[in-house]
A protein has these predicted regions:
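Aromatic-lined, polymer-binding surfaces characteristic
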Residues: 1-186
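Short, acidic/polar N-cap/turn motifs at the starts of alpha helices
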Residues: 4, 226-230, 257, 290, ...
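Beta-sheet entry/capping signal
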Residues: 17, 23, 32, 228, ...
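Catalytic micro-motifs at enzyme active sites that drive phosphoryl/nucleotidyl and oxygen chemistry
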Residues: 58-62, 246-248, 280
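Short, conserved secondary-structure transition motifs
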Residues: 63-69, 102, 190-198, 346-359, ...
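Carbohydrate-active enzyme catalytic cores, enriched for enzymes
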Residues: 113-118, 153-267, 374, 385-395
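Catalytic Cys-His active-site segments of thiol-dependent hydrolases/isopeptidases
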Residues: 268-272
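CBM-like, beta-strand-rich accessory domains located in the C-terminal region of large
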Residues: 274, 278-404
Length: 404
């Protein structure tokens, strides 16, 4: 019961769709529809709404984000001048509002559902305060203090989703105090995204994520959030994680991990994920806490690592223009990446090695050195295996400086 679709083109009388007889569009088919709507003028939206609105508004769907984005896109295109039969849009809105929206869970999926709902409210001039208030509640929880609790990729998904409909929503809701709160929160998230990016705008891989870009920002300072402290000095961006927020979808065991960028290059970017397909094929591989450059603990097991989130912070960062230092207090086993084919130079008080164009030097009372590995997403559907050096000792200090 597969799905094929024939797009309406200029000169044709009708768009025909052969789809599943019972099930709604799959995530893949819905995704194709969304991208077709955004990139082509060949889709007859009247015919789409008439022939397949039940397929576009599934009552239950495991991952309905593309259906949400289709609703937002249709409303926005109408706002931009597309002519559609008003009764079809009204019927579509009513069906959409009956769609399962991952309630009561507040997540990127429920966020995009309510962006779609508010967009349809706006384009049909139905001032439903309930939808707007629910969107504000979800936005407040996800955005926290600006540091998006589901990580960089899903923060970009949410800001792009609401950004597409921003002019429509802003014109309709205007000075509504709830809408003003939503705009303020989205502004905080956008600023955070830029603060966790390097000089080219490539963001850190926080949570389920991969190589993505935002508009770079030219600012220096130390920015304290509940879940991390961001240090921006000269060409350095250092993200000192200290995750405290409660459970969130797509959360990773960053714990006390330190992420490092120098100029346009990420030295330690974060594990992320290459794609759902690859993660689900090897869940233990991609949910392995020691894919991250954390100080090790007894609960470094998939899903149990959250028991470590309440640990006291015993890691600090010192920055200057040329060298940064990561200071680990007490007795620990720490992890850092090392280039393939490179030997580390070790004594009882110092270990030196090179990774990604930077020289690492770890000093302190060193008891043991071992090797391990980690996995990292590079771009969407791309991954690499990273060689790791594990250093066990007391009061360890790691300096990082660019190679000449």
């Amino acid at each position: 019961m597969g799905g094929h679709l024939f797009l309406f083109r200029d000169g044709e009388i009708k768009m025909s769709i052969i789809t599943q007889m019972v099930l709604p569009f799959s995530a893949g088919v819905a995704g194709n529809w969304y991208h077709t709507l955004t990139n082509s003028s060949t889709v007859n939206v009247n015919a789409l709404l008439k022939d397949s609105s039940s397929k576009l508004c599934p009552i239950i769907h495991w991952n309905a984000i593309w259906h949400h984005r289709i609703a937002t896109e249709i409303a926005t295109q109408i706002f931009d001048g597309l002519r559609v039969q008003e009764d079809l849009v009204q019927k579509y809105r009513k069906k959409y509002l009956r769609m399962f929206s991952t309630l009561p869970l507040k997540s990127n999926k429920s966020f995009s559902y309510y962006v779609g709902a508010c967009s349809l409210d706006a384009i049909t001039k139905n001032y439903d305060k309930t939808n707007l208030e629910r969107l504000q509640s979800i936005t407040e929880e996800l955005s926290c203090d600006g540091c998006f609790i589901e990580g960089t990729h899903y923060s970009i998904y949410c800001t792009e989703t609401i950004g597409r409909a921003f002019s429509l929503l802003d014109q309709f809701y205007g000075q509504d105090e709830v809408w003003i709160l939503i705009k303020e929160r989205i502004g905080f998230v956008t600023k955070w995204q830029r603060r966790v990016s390097n000089t080219e705008g490539v963001v850190a891989s926080i949570g389920d994520s991969w190589y993505e870009e935002v508009k770079p920002i030219d600012e220096e300072g130390v920015y304290e959030y509940l879940d991390m402290t961001i240090h921006r000095i000269s060409k350095w961006v250092i993200i000192q994680n200290h995750r405290k927020s409660k459970f969130a979808l797509h959360e990773h065991p960053h714990l006390d991990e330190v992420l490092i960028a120098y100029g346009d290059k990420w030295i330690v970017q974060g594990s992320g994920m290459p794609s759902y397909k690859q993660v689900m094929a090897n869940p233990l591989k991609w949910r392995r806490p020691r894919n991250h450059f954390i100080s090790e603990g007894v609960y470094d097991i998939p899903w149990l690592w959250r028991l470590r989130k309440k640990e006291n912070r015993s890691r600090s960062v010192v920055t200057n223009e040329n060298v940064i230092r990561i200071i680990d207090s007490g007795y620990k086993t720490i992890r850092w990446p090392i280039d393939d084919g490179v030997r580390y130079i070790a004594t009882s008080t110092k270990v030196q090695w090179v990774y990604n164009g930077c020289k690492f030097t770890c000093s302190g009372e060193i008891d043991a050195i071992q090797e391990d590995f980690a996995y990292q997403s590079v771009r969407y559907r791309e991954e690499k295996k990273i060689r790791v050096v594990r250093i066990q000792g007391k009061n360890l200090q790691t300096s990082v400086e660019p190679c000449l």
